[in-house]
Every structure is written in C-alpha cells, then in structure tokens.
C-alpha cells in the first residue's frame, strides 16, 4: 500500500489568498512550520508573518504570490523530540490524559519520520529505486558496468566520442583526396592500361576503405549524439538532485535551530514554573514581582498591586477608578462619578495634598467648586496670589507683591498697559476711563460734565478771556494804498490759516480766499476779499469795498 504523506501539504500562491487550511492534527502551534517555496525556502514567523485564525486555519499577514518570487506555501508538522509536553516524575499522579498526550507526541514524531522517508528515494511497485523526479547529487564515478554514471563522467565520454568522430571525418577527407588523385592517375595512364587498371583497382580499394571509414564515422556521430542527449538529461537530473540536497540540508539546519530554540524555551518555561509560589483555583501566586517589557493586560474588574489599584465598579458613585496611595490612605484617585456615557463634568481627579508641576500646558478650563481657593505660590520672598470667592464675587488677593512691597501689578504684554494697586491708590501708565469720563496722564479730564470737552478747553472757552497780541507782517508803501482787483505784495513773515485774525467765509477755486467784513454804522458795509498763497508768503488783494488795506497783522499764538 502506497504511503500517503499527511504531515506535509503545499498550496499554490496566487497573490490574493491569505488563508490556508491545516489538514493534520498537532499538539502545539509551535510544531507547525510554514515555509514559502520559490526563489528560496523562506520560513515564516508566527505573529509577525502569520497567525492562527482558527485551530485548523492560518492567515498570512501578506498575500504572497509569484510577483514576490514564491509560487507555493508548505505547511509541515515538526513535532519536537526534546520538548516533551508531558514530563513524568517519581511520585506523580499518572493520568490517562497525560499518557495520551505523551503517546500522541510519540506517534506524531513517528508519523513525521515516515512521511520524511516517503518524501526521499523509495522503491516503486516494481521494486526499483525511485528518485521521484529529483536529482541525485554527490555521486561517485561508475566503475562496474551496472554502476550509476554521474554527468561529469558522461561529459568525458562524450568528449572521447567527439574525438573519434573528428578522426573519422579526417579519414573521410583523406579518402576523398585519394580518390581525386586516382582520377588524375587514370587520366594520365591512357597509354598504360595495365598500370591504370592496377591503379583503378587500388583506387576502388581506397574508395571502399573510405566508405567504410565514412560509415564508421557516421556510427560514431550517432553514438556521440545519443551520448550528448543522455549527458544533457543527466545534467538536468544532477542539478535537480543538488537543489533537493541543498533544500534537505537547509531544512535539517532549520529543524536543528528550531529544536535548539524550543529547548531554550523549555528551559525558560521550567524556570518560570519554578517562580510560581502556589495556585488557588484560577489564581496564581508568584514568588516575586512581575516585570513586563510590553503592555500588561489584565481581565475581570480590575487589579491591585499594593500602592496602585484599578477597578471598574462595585462601589456606589465610583466607576472606572484608578487610585494611588499607601496602605492606610489614598493620595490621589481618578474616577468617573456616574455610570453614564457623559464625559463632561463626570470625571474628577482628587489629590489629597499638593500638586507640584515642573511645567506643561493646560488646554481645558480649570474649575474651582464649593468655594475652594486657587493659590499661586512662588518663593517665600516673591509674589503669592490667591483666587478665592468672597460672597458672590471672585477676588484676586495678594499676599506679597515684589521683593520690597506688597504692590499688585496687572500688566498687558500686548498693549504695554500697567495697573498697580498701592495700599490706598492705583497707578496706571495710560489714560484711565471711568464710565464716560477719561483721566489723562497729564491730569486733564474729559467727560459729559464738560460737554465732552477736555477740562482745559472747557475752562478756556467758558471762563478765560485772553488779551490778543498782534504782529504786523505787511504794510503798504507810504502815501499809497492797494486798490481791489490784482494788487500783490510779499509778506516778511509766513502766514497760515491759524494766524489770520479772520474767519474764512468763502472759498473760490483752489486757493484760500478770505473775506473780512468790517462792521460799521455807515452804509454801505465795508469789506475786503484777499488771498494768501505761495506757502503763506504772498498777499493778494482780490477785491474790496471801501476797505483798501494799508497793513496786515497776525495774532500771536
């Protein structure tokens, strides 16, 4: 009965399928070896390259295919012969389950050995050795007639055959030469028939020998061609055998490495078992601490490690609680006060002491509830502030201001505005607004009390009468005057609109034209229209009526 291999199975890779069935039974996942076959044999690592989706199915983390250089995937069971799942000790209880596991492990090892034997050179139904289409490598040269012949020996034989063929061809060429010479002799021996006949006979004999040599050479050529074909097939078989041998060697090395790794793991597990103090039901008590290089997952409703505990319920009004503390009191805890989905105002951090922070940013609001105060404390000789609730008002209270006094200063970094609270007054560095009133830094005051004017302007306009002082800036020539129309002259002092002792009543064109109306009891009323231009240096009498100017004076301001 032919042996059917059960512990090794290969699947074709198509670049899309990632799930493959495991057709055989196994005792532990570490006994299942997954290998990609293509440009090389790539052994995959569990969790990194694949995982067990179910007990009978693996799922690759990547869909491999011919584009990656791999065409098939091999699932092989390699049960450890050193990592015993059951280790019997004197005085232990002998259970059927343990015996079955030990027996199954032994059966698995035997089954894998049988499959490994079936996967190598075997005997076919006729009793002949069968290499199963693979190469036989590292084969010695044949000695006896019934020995297997390596490809190198065949190549040597082929070289000898080719040499014989070449020699036969050389003999044939020489025979052709002899025949040609015979023909020449025949033509030249017209007068000597006897000699010619003799030469002809010799030539015919040479021709027969040449034909014999040609036939022999043809046989050699045919034999050489057959030898070349056989040598080529032998070369292919030898290369296949070499590849299989390399694969077998690599597989053996991998098995040895895995056996060594499993032995190391078994040693680690034995050491781990030695660190267990006792077991109580599903609980495990360790002799020492537990150190985890990665994340530590714990199930059920929480855990307690002495100075830190976490639980997810079991106490009214407290859910998802994390507490830090000592045996008699908890120093800090974070909890969700109500079992709801709401997060805002439902999370609280309680600290039974001071919070000392070296730095950091707070992105959310800081709320003080139940009348508690916020203390901003620095060094003993520096500013200390307290934000507390006084009645219905929130007040800033200062315990100490600067190094030498108790002043409290509020400063705007952007606007450069300062407000300093002294014991009995306040100091500001810019205008101070009180309602609709404004107090300037020079002492001036503006407000509705003064008609929205500054106080100095209001007093000047209402109560103060100034004595006007004038300075003459132009005079007409002696015994002459300027009539209306187009008279002009130059002032010796620049005049502008602020120095006229006049009120402008009209503007004509682009130049300022001022009209002076002189009040009088005589009729008609006298008036003067004039213009100052050229940056206040040129006076022009545009028109006048009974008021020709003789001089111009400006107010001293």
From Swiss-Prot:
Keywords: Host-virus interaction, Late protein, Viral attachment to host adhesion receptor, Viral attachment to host cell, Viral tail fiber protein, Viral tail protein, Virion, Virus entry into host cell. One of its GO terms (cellular component) is virus tail, fiber. Residues 187-197, 235-249 have a biased composition (Polar residues). GO terms for biological process: adhesion receptor-mediated virion attachment to host cell; symbiont entry into host cell. Residues 198-212 have a biased composition (Basic and acidic residues). Residues 187-249 are annotated as: Disordered. It is found in: Virion. Its main location: virion. Residues 221-234 have a biased composition (Low complexity). Structural component of the short non-contractile tail. The tail comprises six fibers made of gp17 trimers, 2 nm in diameter and 32 nm in length. May attach to host lipopolysaccharides (LPS) to mediate primary attachment to the host cell. Belongs to the T7likevirus tail fiber protein family. Homotrimerizes. Interacts with tail components gp11 and gp12. This is Tail fiber protein. It comes from Enterobacteria phage T3.
């Amino acid at each position: 009965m032919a042996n059917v291999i059960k512990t090794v199975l290969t699947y074709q890779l198509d670049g899309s399928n990632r799930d493959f069935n495991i057709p055989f039974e196994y005792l532990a996942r570490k006994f299942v070896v997954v290998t990609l076959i293509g440009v090389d044999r790539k052994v995959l690592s569990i969790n990194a390259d694949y995982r067990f989706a179910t007990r009978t199915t693996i799922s690759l983390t990547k869909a491999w295919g011919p584009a990656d250089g791999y065409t098939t995937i091999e699932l092989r069971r390699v049960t450890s012969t050193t990592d015993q799942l059951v280790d019997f000790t004197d005085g232990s209880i002998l259970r059927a389950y343990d015996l079955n596991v030990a027996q199954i492990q032994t059966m698995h090892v035997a089954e894998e050995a049988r499959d490994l034997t079936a996967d190598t050179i075997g005997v076919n139904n006729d009793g002949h050795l069968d290499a199963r289409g693979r190469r036989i490598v590292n084969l010695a040269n044949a000695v006896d007639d019934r020995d297997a012949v390596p490809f190198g020996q065949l190549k040597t034989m082929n070289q000898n055959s080719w040499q014989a063929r070449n020699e036969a061809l050389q003999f044939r060429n020489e025979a052709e030469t002899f025949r040609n010479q015979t023909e020449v002799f025949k033509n030249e021996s017209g007068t000597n028939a006897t000699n010619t006949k003799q030469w002809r006979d010799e030539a015919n004999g040479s021709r027969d020998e040449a034909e014999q040599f040609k036939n022999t050479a043809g046989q050699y050529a045919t034999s050489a061609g057959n030898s070349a074909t056989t040598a080529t097939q032998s070369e292919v078989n030898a290369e296949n055998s070499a590849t299989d041998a390399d694969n077998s060697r690599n597989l053996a090395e991998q098995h040895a490495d895995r056996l060594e790794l499993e032995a190391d793991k078994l040693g680690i597990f034995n050491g781990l078992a030695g660190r267990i103090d006792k077991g109580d039901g599903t609980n495990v008590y360790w002799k020492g601490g537990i150190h985890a290089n990665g994340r530590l997952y714990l199930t059920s409703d929480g855990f307690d490690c002495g100075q830190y505990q976490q639980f997810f319920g079991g106490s009214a009004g407290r859910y998802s609680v994390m507490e830090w503390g000592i045996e008699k009191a908890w120093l800090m805890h974070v909890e969700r006060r109500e079992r709801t989905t709401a997060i805002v105002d439902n999370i609280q951090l309680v600290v039974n002491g001071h919070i000392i922070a070296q730095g950091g940013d707070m992105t959310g609001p800081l709320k003080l509830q139940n009348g508690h105060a916020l203390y901003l404390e620095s060094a003993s000789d520096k500013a200390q502030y307290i934000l507390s609730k006084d009645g219905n008002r929130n007040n800033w209270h200062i315990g100490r201001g600067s190094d030498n006094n108790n002043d409290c200063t509020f400063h705007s970094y952007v606007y450069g505005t300062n407000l300093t609270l002294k014991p009995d007054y306040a100091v500001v560095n810019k205008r101070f607004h009180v309602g609709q009133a404004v107090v300037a830094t020079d002492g001036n005051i503006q407000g509705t009390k003064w008609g929205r004017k500054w106080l100095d302007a209001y007093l000047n306009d209402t109560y103060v009468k100034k004595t006007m002082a004038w300075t003459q800036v132009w005079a007409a020539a002696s015994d002459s005057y300027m009539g209306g129309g187009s008279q002009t002259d130059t002032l010796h002092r620049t005049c502008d609109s602020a120095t006229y002792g006049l009120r402008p009543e009209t503007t004509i064109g682009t130049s300022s034209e001022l009209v002076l109306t002189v009040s009088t009891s005589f009729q008609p009323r006298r008036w003067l229209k004039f213009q100052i231009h050229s940056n206040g240096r040129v006076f022009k009498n545009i028109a006048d009526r009974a008021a020709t100017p003789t001089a111009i004076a400006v107010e001293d301001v």
